[in-house]
């Protein structure tokens, strides 16, 4: 998993305090081992930051829709459900009753069901293999 978030650094040499910098986060997958979370500070959001950090990485990379991750060779991008849900929620008109015929509302409700299912599975099982098996059983139904 990868994500980047803006931040301001005060008293950084040769940069104004209002200048936007970025903290990049890289997290290992849920493969049964202990999670590894690494952070990288950068003055920019350039996709080369991800390329440099993930040099030699091959596999699935869960991230948001930022195009900078497209530069990472040998990475198969996967979307983050929380980001997709946020995009759908942003597309729903505010201050009005939900229109259940709208794709954005239907998508948000479907993702809510996925999140609920994941909570149920994780409350019952703690090992990666058991969680994976339960997910696959639910998928086949």
Describe each region flagged by the PLM:
Residues 1-141:
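Catalytic center-proximal scaffold of phosphoryl-transfer enzymes
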């Amino acid at each position: 998993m990868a994500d980047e978030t803006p931040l301001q650094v005060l008293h950084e040499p040769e940069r104004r305090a209002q200048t936007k910098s970025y903290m990049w986060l890289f997290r290992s997958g849920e493969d049964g081992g202990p999670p590894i979370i690494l952070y990288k500070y950068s003055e920019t959001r350039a996709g080369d930051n991800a390329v440099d950090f993930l040099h030699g990485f091959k596999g699935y990379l869960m991230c948001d829709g930022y195009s900078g991750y497209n530069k990472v060779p040998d990475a198969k991008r996967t979307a983050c459900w929380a980001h997709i849900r946020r995009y759908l929620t942003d597309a729903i008109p505010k201050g009005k009753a939900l229109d259940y015929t709208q794709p954005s509302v239907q998508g948000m409700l479907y993702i809510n069901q996925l999140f609920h299912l994941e909570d149920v599975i994780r409350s019952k099982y703690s090992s990666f293999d058991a969680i994976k098996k339960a997910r696959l059983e639910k998928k086949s139904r």
